[in-house]
Amino acid sequence: MPLSTSLLGKKSTYKDSYDVTLLFKIPRINNRNELGINSNNLPFYGVDVWNTYELSCLNKNGKPWVGVGTFYIPTDSENIVESKSFKLYLNSFNNFVVESVKELERIILQDLSNVTHAKVTGRIFPINTKVEFGVPSGKNIDDLDIVCNNYGAPDNSLIEYEDVLVEEEINSNLLKSNCLVTGQPDWGTIVIKYKGKKLKHDSFLKYLISFRNCNEFAEQCAERIFTDIKNAISPDFLSISIVYTRRGGIDICPYRSTDKSYTLPSDKRFIRQ
């Protein structure tokens, strides 16, 4: 189903009973073809981490239960799930009786796996789970004194490098783009770790800021940045993680790495989450 004929980006009525058909799948191949990424031979490994903060159902006595969930969609899944459709889907559990939290977890994981055509993992947590805030790892480049004038479309020609090999980790809180469906802003913190020719921090910050008015899904923004860095400096190692702020009770955190045995960054939330 094309986006134009879906309910996405339109006024929606919340269902009062569980409805898996609310999940709207989007093939990854469409955006990857645009980026020149071969879906049969991906240049990266990774996952999209989805954190859900508005999750509720009824127990067998009709009493509401609330919690939060974290779900991991592998980067080699055939499809992604559009975030608004996921929100509508989760809210369809609000008046649905579930025997246990484990049963709710099983249903959601099974539905996501079926829609994405991949093995989705995750867990649902009680609302009183203790949470600690963290800070992005690496060197922050946001205070560099630069002049910016490109906000129309991501401009990879802004990426410059020095002909010296380094291994470093940098981060920025200035990444911002817009949802392809709704046009609503997506605010992100990005952490880049790489080994290769040294990125010039000032020009790279300009590059990140050039996403400011870009209309793309969070996952595509992550893969565009990964691809642009890879094409620019041909690093021996590269990983990027983006932590987006929540919208509609959901935040999406894409992670991409050249390392098959990658380890996800800390699961501590940043202050904007």
Curated annotation (Swiss-Prot):
Q: Which domain of life is it from?
A: Bacteria
Tell me which UniProt keywords the record has, alphabetically.
Cytoplasm, NADP, Oxidoreductase, Queuosine biosynthesis
Its predominant location is: cytoplasm
A GO biological process held by the record: queuosine biosynthetic process
Q: Could you tell me which Pfam families the record lists for this protein?
A: QueF, QueF_N
Where does this protein hold NADPH? 83-84, 247-248
Give me the reactions it catalyses: 7-aminomethyl-7-carbaguanine + 2 NADP(+) = 7-cyano-7-deazaguanine + 2 NADPH + 3 H(+)
Q: Which residues form the active site?
A: 179, 186
- Database matches in NCBIfam families: QueF
Family listed: Belongs to the GTP cyclohydrolase I family. QueF type 2 subfamily.
- Protein's name according to its UniProt entry: NADPH-dependent 7-cyano-7-deazaguanine reductase
Q: State the organism of origin.
A: Rickettsia massiliae (strain Mtu5)
State the taxonomy lineage.
Answer: Bacteria, Pseudomonadati, Pseudomonadota, Alphaproteobacteria, Rickettsiales
Instruction: Quote the gene name from the UniProt entry.
Output: queF
